[in-house]
């Protein structure tokens, strides 16, 4: 019987006999004495086996990395000069008396302590990958966060209620994952993109405070922070306004960080969406980086430089500057790389000015400003740019000029990239936790491709008081009672006050060009139940995967999920998705128009 975990044996167990079980992390033979580092989920302990115990010595001699052993022995101090203060077990070792080989192991595809393994190799051999201490720590922290959330919400009076995994398809936003019904040929269930409508109906039913930690599914193009199936901390409340909901969920975030990381997040400032976009070009600004946009659109309307003038005069156009302290030292190669980088976001180029001498702001050859564009700008404009940005000698000013969407995305991404690469050495990056709330989102945004307005969050978000009429008369300026929790440039949670009146919900659907017939077909069950005395209600959903990724410092959410999918939505461990035989398809009344092709990653 095991008496202790390997990584938890300390000096308090000196001279005691213990039994540990685990995997051979490393085996060393030193002059006839064998050393084994035995590993389990709590860490590693050093075991010494000498020839005086021949059976144990023989078992140790035949063991290799990843063999599973049971070891009984006496705890003793390590010799002077061989201790490791970074480990709980770093000052002791076990002198083995008995060793039992519980299972042999084939040679693993990589060493457990190898840090230079490709992600595809790791995901193909995920079980072995999960033995690595970093993965064990990540998933343990994930568990601690989930348990902390449950404890906090339970103390706040929330009830854990499960909602269906098989529901109806409502194709708004991302694509649904569909499940064919055998019992109802030709009809399909959808896996939920969120429990949104069910949790609202639970409020109508009178449960007052609901939560669950649940799987959600979206068939969308994947990025580093996306998965086709992801875990959501979902909650909903009745009779609370947005300030009260934000206070509860902010308290939850603070408690979780304190318990799991011993970090005090402090109070969360609140920033209107318009301010976030104006100064940072993003609705999830990374406040660790002390760089802001400077607005130049008005200034460029009277300039002759076509690149800037054209953007300033364009409907929905924008011209901004981004001052980077000490950036004049950037090489031509670095600037070219930044130019290529902003091109990813649709920018056609990256204009810049290096500030060498603010006392000489002419546009002539002797100018204290170094740039190919200086000669195209008036001296008045150059002086105004320096004044507005506050640029000093040694700075560089980058410019964005295009449609506002392109400028915001391109220069916003450049702000992050420059800040992370150069900010710490130059005083404009603070390496600490910087949370905030972004509030007062627009209710709608115009989708040029679809030629209609679409909901910024979702169509069940309530408009701000006094903005109801704007949904029809001026949808572009209609604000929503929505709020996002942002941490270090990541949106970790988003929510809103919901629409609790059927007539208002119908108005929102109408503004989104959803006909009354389509409303009834897709959302009739919601509209019908809102008429039975629905209380005012609202809520929020956290992305558990994203939250834990931030807390662990992992490079991808795939590093905090036990069995994730790749960026092509495949499981390399099980080779899912896979083709199925014709018999299964016939049972589901399905026939393939196109046979499956081999697209597995290698």
From Swiss-Prot:
CDD domains: AspRS_core (cd00777), EcAspRS_like_N (cd04317). It is an enzyme of class 6 (ligase). It is found in: Cytoplasm. GO terms for biological process: aspartyl-tRNA aminoacylation. L-aspartate binds at residues 172, 218, 457, 498. ATP binds at residues 218-220, 227, 491, 543-546. Pfam families: GAD, tRNA-synt_2, tRNA_anti-codon. Keywords: Aminoacyl-tRNA synthetase, ATP-binding, Cytoplasm, Ligase, Nucleotide-binding, Protein biosynthesis. The record marks 30, 81 as: Important for tRNA non-discrimination. PANTHER family: ASPARTATE--TRNA LIGASE, MITOCHONDRIAL, ASPARTYL/LYSYL-TRNA SYNTHETASE. Aspartyl-tRNA synthetase with relaxed tRNA specificity since it is able to aspartylate not only its cognate tRNA(Asp) but also tRNA(Asn). Reaction proceeds in two steps: L-aspartate is first activated by ATP to form Asp-AMP and then transferred to the acceptor end of tRNA(Asp/Asn). This is Aspartate--tRNA(Asp/Asn) ligase. It comes from Neisseria meningitidis serogroup B (strain ATCC BAA-335 / MC58).
């Amino acid at each position: 019987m095991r008496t202790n975990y390997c990584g938890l044996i300390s000096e308090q167990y000196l001279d005691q006999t213990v039994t540990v079980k685990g995997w051979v992390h490393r085996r060393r033979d030193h002059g006839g004495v064998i050393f084994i580092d035995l590993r389990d989920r709590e860490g590693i302990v050093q075991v010494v086996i000498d020839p005086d115990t021949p059976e144990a010595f023989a078992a140790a001699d035949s063991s290799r990395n990843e063999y599973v052993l049971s070891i009984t022995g006496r705890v003793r101090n390590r010799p002077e000069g061989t201790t490791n203060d970074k480990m709980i077990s770093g000052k002791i070792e076990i002198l083995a008396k008995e060793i039992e080989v519980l299972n042999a192991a084939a040679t693993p595809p990589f060493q457990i302590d190898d840090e230079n393994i490709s992600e595809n190799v790791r995901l193909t051999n995920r079980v072995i990958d999960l033995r690595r201490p970093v993965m064990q720590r990540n998933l343990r922290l994930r568990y601690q966060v989930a348990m902390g959330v449950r404890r906090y919400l339970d103390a706040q009076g929330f009830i854990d209620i499960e909602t269906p995994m098989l529901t109806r398809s409502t194709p708004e936003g991302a694509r649904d994952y569909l499940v064919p019904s055998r019992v109802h040929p030709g009809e399909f269930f959808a896996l939920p993109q969120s429990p949104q409508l069910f949790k609202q109906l639970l409020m109508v039913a009178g449960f007052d405070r609901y939560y669950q930690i649940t799987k959600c599914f979206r068939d969308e193009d994947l990025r580093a922070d996306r998965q086709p199936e992801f875990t959501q901390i979902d909650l909903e409340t009745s009779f609370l306004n947005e300030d009260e909901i934000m206070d509860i969920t902010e308290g939850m975030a603070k408690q979780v960080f304190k318990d799991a990381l011993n970090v005090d997040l402090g109070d969360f400032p609140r920033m209107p969406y318009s301010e976030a976009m104006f100064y940072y070009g993003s609705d999830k600004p990374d406040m660790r980086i002390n760089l802001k946009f400077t607005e130049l659109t008005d200034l460029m309307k009277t300039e002759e430089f076509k690149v800037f003038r054209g953007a300033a005069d364009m409907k929905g156009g924008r011209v901004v500057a981004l001052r980077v302290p000490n950036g004049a030292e950037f090489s031509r190669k670095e600037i070219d790389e930044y130019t290529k980088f902003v091109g990813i976001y649709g920018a056609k180029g990256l204009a810049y000015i290096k500030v060498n001498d603010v006392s000489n702001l002419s546009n002539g050859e002797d100018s204290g400003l170094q740039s190919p564009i200086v000669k195209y700008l008036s001296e008045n404009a150059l002086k105004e740019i320096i004044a507005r940005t506050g640029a000093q000698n040694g700075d560089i000013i980058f410019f964005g000029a295009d449609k506002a969407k392109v400028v915001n995305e391109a220069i916003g991404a450049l702000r992050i990239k420059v800040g992370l690469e150069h900010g710490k050495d130059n005083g404009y990056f603070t390496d600490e936790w910087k949370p905030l709330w972004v509030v007062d989102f627009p209710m709608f945004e115009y989708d040029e491709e679809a030629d209609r307005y679409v909901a910024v969050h979702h169509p069940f978000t309530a408009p701000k008081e006094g903005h109801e009429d704007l949904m029809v008369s001026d949808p572009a300026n209609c604000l929503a009672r929505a709020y996002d929790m942002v941490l270090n440039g990541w949106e970790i949670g988003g929510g809103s006050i919901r629409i609790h009146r059927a007539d208002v919900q119908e108005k929102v659907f109408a503004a989104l060009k959803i006909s009354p017939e389509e409303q009834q077909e897709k959302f009739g069950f919601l509209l019908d139940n809102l008429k039975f005395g629905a209380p005012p209600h609202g809520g929020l959903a956290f992305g558990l995967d994203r939250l834990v990724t931030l807390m662990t410092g992992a490079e991808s959410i795939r590093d905090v999920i036990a069995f994730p999918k790749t960026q092509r939505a495949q499981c390399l461990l099980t080779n899912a998705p896979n083709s199925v035989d014709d018999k299964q398809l016939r049972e589901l009344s399905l026939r393939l128009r196109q046979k499956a092709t081999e697209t597995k990653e290698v």
